[in-house]
Amino acid sequence: MFFKKNKKKETSSMANGEDTKKLDKKELIDEAENLINTIDSVSGDERIKVLNRIGSLYFEADKIDDAIKYYEISISENKSLGKAYTELVKLYNIKRKEAISKKDDESMKHYIEKIDSLLQLSKDVIRGRV
């Protein structure tokens, strides 16, 4: 009764093809590779943004190891809480769950330690030690 009008708008916008189009994995990887070529030409905050964007593109393309690599570089260059930090926690948890399902104790411990180090980083940032 109250939400009838909103439902009509949703269905009409979807029928018109106005819903956001997701890039396919190849396009995401291509965009990430193009950005990788620009990393050396940027510095400071712009470099961090590029590294985070590359990590994000790889994450969307389900290239978890590559996403982790670029987010870790971003965190090592700019020790602050933000997108790289939150995405790394998600990625480490994905890898930890994969290790659990494969019954790989070493990998599981590795990613638990990685998560612990991120937790320590967050404590250090909050306390102003970094």
Predicted regions and their residues:
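Conserved structural position within tetratricopeptide repeats
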Residues: 37-41, 75-76, 110, 117-120, ...
